[in-house]
Swiss-Prot record:
Its EC number is 4.2.1.9. Pathway: Amino-acid biosynthesis; L-isoleucine biosynthesis; L-isoleucine from 2-oxobutanoate: step 3/4; Amino-acid biosynthesis; L-valine biosynthesis; L-valine from pyruvate: step 3/4. The lineage of its organism: Bacteria, Pseudomonadati, Pseudomonadota, Gammaproteobacteria, Enterobacterales. Mg(2+) binds at D81, D123, K124, E491. It comes from the Bacteria. Gene3D superfamilies: IlvD/EDD C-terminal domain-like (3.50.30.80). This is Dihydroxy-acid dehydratase. Binds 1 [2Fe-2S] cluster per subunit. This cluster acts as a Lewis acid cofactor. One of its GO terms (cellular component) is cytosol. Belongs to the IlvD/Edd family.
């Protein structure tokens, strides 16, 4: 029978000092036999996805206390990728994931907490907390802040939906007037919550449902809607039940590694491919799997990508649908239901509610459930009122979107495409693979060949694009922007957005050892592995080299002879300590980022730390 971890600090005469300090936090004698549950919040006023979380930790804590636990809250950092985008701040985004994971480990282990409720939302916060949860392997429930409502404005006599990416594209488009750009900017992000499309934050919050670590509705129920409050209340009650099941009944099924099994990871990736999620999710799932000591690799993702169709299409891949529309169609469970009926899921998995996949679908799939309360929850919709307050409205759609032929979520028979929304490509400069979000690629450029325009920083590429130096047919290559080479593996949302604003969105390709925002669409291929800074062949590409991209056949090829590549590699190695570094880039790199770079692996490993360098 496992012993409560917290007993280390609450029992025994030699812990008198620790108990004295616990008493100073408000604990009493009656609390010293109860489980201590960490409420891991991420409130900050810097990030719209987190600005409303201040009081939500208290909601969870009250339920923990009422159920017989002791709640202790702390905060992690949270970086807003959109605000950090396009300047040196983006170097810090991915490294913040490791800091978040480590800080959760530090706090939970230092104070011997027994379990956790993780209140996350945006891009690196959910992955960082997920990594920590699987590393620590103590009972956990995730409950995120929820998606932002889509922006809406009137353009050309039509009401259109908007998001952050629209503001960026219009702001860079010389054909758009100042007044229209300002109108879009003011309308794009109307409420608190994670940006309204199927970007990285919402993709990851959806995947926690498929992993079984959050409740149905977590990924899609709007941040502003009153119904979302129930997820927080339920999380506080349920975590105490899970904690007691493990520590008092020796039930290891309550532990996250037994919930988020390899079968669950395969389901999560299947969901991601079907819903056309952000390419960043690949990076984060690979990292989380390593923390869970699960053998889940790019090879597994490649196999799934070849058999899973695209059943959902959401911004940025279309302007018709945002997360509020996914929710109306049944949310994550709605997509999982269609995948299950297609025979594409592992059914022998459970979630934090203790339900098997078939039980979850029977109760929460809008195409199956007889529960009017569940149907009502999925009718929760936007209010269209600017606010930074959680649970501030209770508007509902008149009806559910259960049209699986033409609606937001499709059945297998009516899939958007037989190929899924993500693909892994391999070739002679991506020997370990690279990732493309096929959901955002126009059919006309699924096969593409063009000459390379090579840049050794995102800034140089942006300058060239806006300066008219990139023309239709070019393949823009941005290298030395990987985890080690950046360092920090910057997102390339500005280059892809500016290609669109210059009318080149369907006329050019962009390839990088960096990564892309969840808001990226177009022929944008990232995560090239090995990265240039690790001796990857992307570092050997020269201006004018022809690059052939073949998404249907999962290929990407530099059309240069092996002999020529060998000669270029020899010349690169001859640079000595300057080998595999940019030739003409001046970038100030802080000691914090240098420390990150010294241990970083390439994207095919999830950009996690190289444990071999740490004796692991």
């Amino acid at each position: 029978m496992p012993k409560y971890r917290s007993a280390t600090t609450t029992h025994g005469r030699n812990m008198a000092g620790a108990r004295a300090l616990w008493r100073a936090t408000g604990m009493t004698d009656a609390d010293f036999g109860k489980p201590i549950i960490a409420v891991v919040n991420s409130f900050t006023q810097f990030v719209p996805g987190h600005v409303h979380l201040r009081d939500l930790g208290k909601l969870v804590a009250e339920q923990i206390e009422a159920a017989g636990g002791v709640a202790k809250e702390f905060n992690t950092i949270a970086v807003d990728d959109g605000i950090a985008m396009g300047h040196g701040g983006m170097l810090y985004s991915l490294p913040s994931r490791e800091l978040i994971a480590d800080s959760v480990e530090y706090m939970v282990n230092a104070h011997c907490a027994d379990a956790m409720v993780c209140i996350s939302n945006c891009d690196k916060i959910t992955p960082g907390m997920l990594m920590a949860s699987l590393r620590l392997n103590i009972p956990v429930i995730f409950v995120s802040g929820g998606p932002m409502e889509a922006g809406k404005t009137k353009l050309s006599e039509q009401i259109i939906k908007l998001d952050l990416v629209d503001a960026m594209i219009q702001g860079a488009d010389p054909k758009v007037s100042d007044s229209q750009s300002d109108q879009v900017e003011r309308s794009a992000c109307p409420t608190c919550g994670s940006c309204s499309g199927m970007f990285t934050a919402n993709s990851m919050n959806c995947l926690t449902e498929a992993l079984g670590l959050s409740q149905p509705g977590n990924g899609s129920l709007l941040a502003t809607h009153a119904d979302r409050k129930q997820l927080f209340l339920n999380a506080g009650k349920r975590i105490v039940e899970l904690t007691k099941r493990y520590y008092e009944q020796n039930d290891e099924s309550a532990l996250p590694r037994n919930i988020a099994s390899k079968a669950a990871f395969e389901n999560a990736m299947t969901l991601d491919i079907a819903m056309g999620g952000s390419t960043n999710t690949v990076l984060h799932l690979l990292a989380a799997a390593q923390e869970a000591e699960i053998d889940f690799t790019m090879s597994d993702i490649d196999k799934l990508s070849r058999k899973v169709p695209q059943l959902c299409k959401v911004a940025p891949s279309t302007q018709k649908y945002h997360m509020e529309d996914v929710h109306r169609a049944g949310g994550v469970i709605g997509i999982l239901g269609e995948l299950d009926r297609a025979g594409l899921l592992n059914r022998d998995v459970k979630n934090v509610l203790g339900l098997t996949l078939p039980q979850t679908l029977e109760q929460y799939d809008v195409m199956l459930t007889q529960d009017d309360a569940v149907k009502n929850m999925f009718r929760a919709g936007p209010a269209g009122i600017r606010t930074t307050q959680a649970f501030s409205q209770d508007c509902r759609w008149d009806s559910l979107d259960d049209d699986r032929a033409n609606g937001c979520i499709r059945s297998l028979e009516h899939a958007y495409s037989k190929d899924g929304g993500l693909a892994v490509l391999y070739g002679n400069f991506a020997e370990n693979g690279c990732i493309v979000k096929t959901a955002g690629v126009d059919d006309s450029i699924l096969k593409f060949t063009g000459p390379a325009k090579v840049y050794e920083s995102q800034d140089d590429a942006v300058e060239a694009i806006l300066g008219g130096k990139v023309v239709a047919g070019d393949v823009v290559v941005i290298r030395y922007e990987g985890p080690k080479g950046g360092p920090g593996m910057q997102e390339m949302l500005y280059p892809t957005s500016f290609l669109k604003s210059m009318g080149l969105g369907k006329a050019c390709a962009l390839i990088t050892d960096g990564r892309f925002s969840g808001g990226t669409s177009g022929l944008s291929i990232g995560h090239v592995s090995p990265e240039a800074a690790s001796g990857g062949s992307i570092g050997l590409i020269e201006d004018g080299d022809l690059i052939a991209i073949d998404i249907p056949n999962r290929g990407i090829q530099l059309q240069v002879s092996d002999a020529e590549l060998a000669a270029r590699r020899e010349a690169q190695e001859a640079r000595g300590d300057k080998a595999w570094t940019p030739k003409n880039r001046e970038r100030q790199v802080s000691f914090a980022l240098r420390a990150y770079a010294s241990l970083a692996t390439s994207a095919d490993k999830g950009a996690v730390r190289d444990k071999s360098k740490l004796g692991g």
